[in-house]
Amino acid sequence: VEREGSAHRIREPVMKKIEAVIRHYKLEDVKNALTQAKVEGMTVTEVRGFGRQRGHKEMYRGAEYTVDFLPKVKIEVVVTESLLKDAVDTIMRVARTGQIGDGKIFITDLAEVIRIRTGETGESAM
């Protein structure tokens, strides 16, 4: 189903954006596993945050202080609905340690993808 947008037709969501906040040291393994699962392309951002893990205490020049935001990595991938389950299962399996602080996965509908260089849209732009 398509609806008219500004210069492009906007399709109803058939693609999903997966954002996963994971531990730094799990990044390479997750990247390799997603590549094997036929997920192509990834954006990686250094982020800081906290959840149930909260912060931790550190010593600096003899003084103790609390670090509220912990360093993590956020990976973003866009997949078709047919690859969604495999991609999410892969991230869960590879990034999980079983400890607090393993991270979160967020899944959102993606209305459109446009390749800037060619103007291709949808799956062909991925």
Language-model segments: residues:
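Positively charged, small/polar-rich N-terminal and surface patches that mediate targeting and assembly
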Residues: 2-126
